[in-house]
């Protein structure tokens, strides 16, 4: 270990920054947030330092580096654009046994600054030992996405409850189970973020009163259309906290690789015309696992409330009294059209967009007359097997035969393929495409040649 990671208590302690530019300003901001009593020594200062000085937040000393300013300091930072001056600051601090950071010169420094994820009082620091700051920044960004913004409020509130938890739960095991429930309770976190004291108190009392082996909960998460980068931050957080993930075939391998490693996984792959697991059985799986006290994530491609049968699954849970929540996802229509260079609306071509299922219940019929109207875009989900019928019906109800159409296969993924033509070719084009695929009908498809960006990357 090249460096010992420590967290310094700097509140009301004297610290010195030498330098008055942008880099020094970023360092000063961190020290001020830590409550340091800050002095800044430089030949010139950018305006922000003057603002802080006028507000009494720090002291400015204009002029060359004055090493006597170090005499009362606990910590120093050299942040000038002059290597010679920075080395003088480092040497003067070293002679006084004061820790000193030298910006962009880790070998000249006695401490380095990590990349910080601030969820005070929870703090996470990431460092590459000064060898690769970019790598440390990338790791910090990844951790930022995993830690909810309101986590600090939850941690602070947990501190207020420690004595009560210790009094109510006799064993370490019981306390651990309580805290596990506490920290994954979305309702509590959201209530704290909204400063809803009434909801916070109600949720807290419920957590203390219910048995530790109480029924779990189900979170319905939209995984987006395929590209793992389109998974929402909240969706990522949920699959990282799951005890069990129930997923279908539209969830990509890249997204499944983000699931918590020790979570159980249940595949319930479905596609139009063939159900690997019947819907009623899926409903029962969710119910059964939640009743065991597990945190269940039902992971669905796209958005769970847009042709995802999410409402049906939640009705079962609702009837059984199982708590649930929903994390929306980017629906296939939005993702596939964007990655195909096809805007769903456009002032010149489409003032509305319709999302339509091509897989109806037996005896069902679409409103073809309205679907054939001008100035709109149609997006058919699960319509591949019905492409010839869609073509026939739209033409029969008055849509122009030369209306542009596109079929997007494996949208937003590296396997994405788009075939396009006109309405009279739709049935034929569908023979060239495999599921999962989306059908887009409308004048906006004609913009694809101009706006297609994804296949050019």
Curated annotation (Swiss-Prot):
The keyword Phosphoprotein applies. GO terms for biological process: cobalamin biosynthetic process; methylation; siroheme biosynthetic process. PANTHER family: SIROHEME SYNTHASE, SIROHEME SYNTHASE-RELATED. Residues 216-457 are annotated as: Uroporphyrinogen-III C-methyltransferase. SUPFAM superfamilies: NAD(P)-binding Rossmann-fold domains, Siroheme synthase middle domains-like, Tetrapyrrole methylase. S-adenosyl-L-methionine binds at residues 225, 301-303, 306, 331-332, 382, 411. It catalyses: uroporphyrinogen III + 2 S-adenosyl-L-methionine = precorrin-2 + 2 S-adenosyl-L-homocysteine + H(+); precorrin-2 + NAD(+) = sirohydrochlorin + NADH + 2 H(+); siroheme + 2 H(+) = sirohydrochlorin + Fe(2+). NAD(+) binds at residues 22-23, 43-44. It comes from the Bacteria. Residues 1-204 are annotated as: Precorrin-2 dehydrogenase /sirohydrochlorin ferrochelatase. The modification Phosphoserine is found at residue 128. Its EC number is 2.1.1.107, 1.3.1.76, 4.99.1.4. Keywords: Cobalamin biosynthesis, Lyase, Methyltransferase, Multifunctional enzyme, NAD, Oxidoreductase, Phosphoprotein, Porphyrin biosynthesis, S-adenosyl-L-methionine, Transferase. One of its GO terms (molecular function) is precorrin-2 dehydrogenase activity. Signal peptide: none annotated. HAMAP family: Siroheme_synth (MF_01646). This is Siroheme synthase. CDD domains: SUMT. In the N-terminal section; belongs to the precorrin-2 dehydrogenase / sirohydrochlorin ferrochelatase family. In the C-terminal section; belongs to the precorrin methyltransferase family. Coiled coil: none annotated. InterPro entries: 4pyrrol_Mease, 4pyrrol_Methylase_sf, 4pyrrole_Mease_sub1, 4pyrrole_Mease_sub2, CobA/CysG_C, NAD(P)-bd_dom_sf, Siro_Cobalamin_biosynth, Sirohaem_synt_dimer_dom_sf. Pfam families: CysG_dimeriser, NAD_binding_7, Sirohm_synth_M, TP_methylase. The active site is at 248 (proton acceptor), 270 (proton donor). Then it catalyzes the NAD-dependent ring dehydrogenation of precorrin-2 to yield sirohydrochlorin. Finally, it catalyzes the ferrochelation of sirohydrochlorin to yield siroheme. The lineage of its organism: Bacteria, Pseudomonadati, Pseudomonadota, Gammaproteobacteria, Enterobacterales. NCBIfam families: cobA_cysG_Cterm, cysG_Nterm, PRK06136.1, PRK10637.1.
